[in-house]
C-alpha cells in the first residue's frame, strides 16, 4: 500500500488527477454504481436535460476493465506524464489550458460526429503533441516496427484499424493535436505570426506556483560595495 501511495505522490499533479479520474470512473462502472449510459457524450441531453457532467465523464471512461482499457491507460498515463514533465515542465497552467483547448475542440467535433466517448481521441491528441515536440526520438512498437516519434500517431491509427475500431476517433485526436501544435509551435514563429493560445491569467493564478518577487537591490543581503573606498585593512604591529 505504501508503494502505491508513493507512486501516486511521484506523479505530476495533472497526470495524477486525470488518470486517477479515469480509473475511479471505470471502477464505479465495474461495481455498478453507475452505468455507461449515464456517462457517454450526448449533446441533446447536455443542452436539454442539463446533464453537464457528460462533458467530463465522456473523457474519463475507456470501457470496462480489459486489454483495451489497459492499453489506453498506459498510453494516456505515459504521454500525459512525459508532456507534463517535458515541454510543459514548470508551466502547469499552460498544460491545463492545452487540456481545455483540446477538450473544447473535441466537444465541438462530437456535436457533428457520433462518438460516444472522447477519451481515446484525447489520448491520441496527447501522443500527437508529444511526438511533434520530440521528432528525433526513435520508437519501437512491440518490437516489430522502428520509426521516429512523429509517425507514432499514424502507427496507432493503423493498429486501431487492425483491431476493428472506429478510425474517426483517432483522426479526431490527430486533427485536434495538430491544430494545437500549429497554433502554439508553428504559426507564432512565422512571419507576421501571432500566438493565439496565450494562457489566461486566472489559470496562471490557480495552477502555477507563485514565486516571491525579488527584493530591491539595495535590500538584498550580502555582497560588497565595489566603489572607490576599499575596506580598511587591519593594522598589525
Swiss-Prot record:
GO terms for biological process: endoplasmic reticulum unfolded protein response; ERAD pathway; IRE1-mediated unfolded protein response; positive regulation of cell growth; positive regulation of cell population proliferation; retrograde protein transport, ER to cytosol. Residues 226-237 have a biased composition (Acidic residues). Keywords: Endoplasmic reticulum, Membrane, Protein transport, Stress response, Transmembrane, Transmembrane helix, Transport. It is found in: Endoplasmic reticulum membrane. SUPFAM superfamilies: Rhomboid-like. Residues 1-20, 76-97, 188-237 are cytoplasmic. Induction: By endoplasmic reticulum stress. GO terms for molecular function: signal recognition particle binding. Residues 212-222 have a biased composition (Basic and acidic residues). Coiled coil: none annotated. The keyword Transmembrane helix applies. It is a multi-pass membrane protein. May be required for the degradation process of some specific misfolded endoplasmic reticulum (ER) luminal proteins. Participates in the transfer of misfolded proteins from the ER to the cytosol, where they are destroyed by the proteasome in a ubiquitin-dependent manner. Its precise function remains unclear, but its ability to complement der1 mutations in C.cerevisiae, suggests a similar function in the degradation of ER misfolded proteins. This is Derlin-2.
